[in-house]
Each structure stands twice: as C-alpha cells, then as structure tokens.
C-alpha cells in the first residue's frame, strides 16, 4: 500500500458512516443513541485525520480534493437532516436548506476551479465553520442521549448556536466565492 493514499482511505468511511448514523438515530433505544454518537465521533476524527495527514506529509491528490469535501458534506448534512426530524424547533428546515445550498454552490465552484487547474484551499473560516458544526452536532447528540427536554436552558442556547452556525456557514460561502472569483477570468 502506498502511504500517499491514506487520506483518501480515511475519507471513504465517512460517506458510509452517514447512513449508519441515521439508522442508529432512528432506532430510538439508548444503546443505539450511544452508537450514533460514536459513529459521528469516528467520522469527525477521520475528517481531522485525513486533512492533517494530507497536509503534514503532502499526500494531497486531485481525487482527495474531490472526495474530502463531499465526504464532509455527506456526514454533516446527514446529521443535520436527522436532527431536524427529531428537533425541528432547534434545527429548522430553512437552516438546513441554507447550509445545503451553500455547500452545493461552494462544492460546484470548487470543481469549476479545479477544472481550470486552480485549487481552492480551505480557508480558516471554513475550518472554523466545520468545527462549530461538528461540536454543535455532538452537543445535540449528547442531549438527545439523555432526552433534550431535560435541558430547557441548553435547548434555547442550541437554537441560537444553530442560527449562528447557519449564518456563519452562509458567510463562509460568500467569502469563498469572493476571494476565488478572480481565478475564473
């Protein structure tokens, strides 16, 4: 095995963990709730590891540049869609629509740039966005484990964090387009 493919090998499981995460979430039994947290946590760690290894050892590839953002979006959007079904007053449908629309536009823009031999690097703002999304999802999953209704103060906070996350996600999309638009000329 060539070590340069390790980041890609770490990206693939995230795509397959997403439906598994969703299945366990819908099995509304305590052990399955724990498994859904573990699955999402593993996906989050794999996201960190593939990027870290790719950058540290310069194991970046064109295929990985396509695969990694798609794997990220599949895992995170699957989590938000599932959480929307459980907590529609916290993770609102319009918020998910904004996040999905932004992700589709940025991903298509990234692919367009790649077809023009331009690599759109992940900005520190987008990395922060992903971190906030992952932390928020983990918090909701832990609260789901113990029944969210037991945390009324946190429940209100979660809504505002989700709102912030949605707005910040939109702003990072605008930022990406703005700083990379000149590469299309």
Regions from the language model: what does each represent?
Residues 1-185:
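Alpha-helical transmembrane bundles and membrane-interface segments of multipass inner-membrane proteins
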């Amino acid at each position: 095995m060539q070590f340069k493919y390790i980041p890609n090998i770490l990206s693939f499981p995230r795509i397959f963990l997403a439906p598994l995460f969703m299945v366990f979430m819908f099995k509304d039994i305590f052990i399955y709730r724990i498994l859904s947290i573990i699955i999402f946590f593993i996906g989050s760690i794999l996201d960190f590891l593939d990027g870290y290894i790719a950058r540290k050892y310069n194991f970046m590839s064109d295929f990985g540049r396509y695969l990694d953002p798609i794997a990220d979006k599949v895992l995170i959007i699957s989590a938000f869609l599932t959480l929307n079904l459980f907590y529609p007053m916290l993770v609102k449908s319009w918020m998910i629509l904004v996040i999905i629309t932004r992700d589709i536009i940025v991903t298509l823009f990234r692919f367009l740039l790649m077809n023009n031999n331009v690599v759109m690097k992940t900005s520190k703002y987008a990395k922060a966005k992903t971190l906030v999304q992952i932390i928020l999802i983990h918090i909701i999953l832990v609260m789901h484990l113990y029944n969210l209704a037991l945390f009324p103060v946190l429940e209100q906070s979660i809504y505002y964090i989700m709102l912030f996350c949605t707005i910040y996600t939109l702003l990072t999309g605008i930022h990406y387009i703005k700083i990379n638009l000149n590469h299309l000329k």
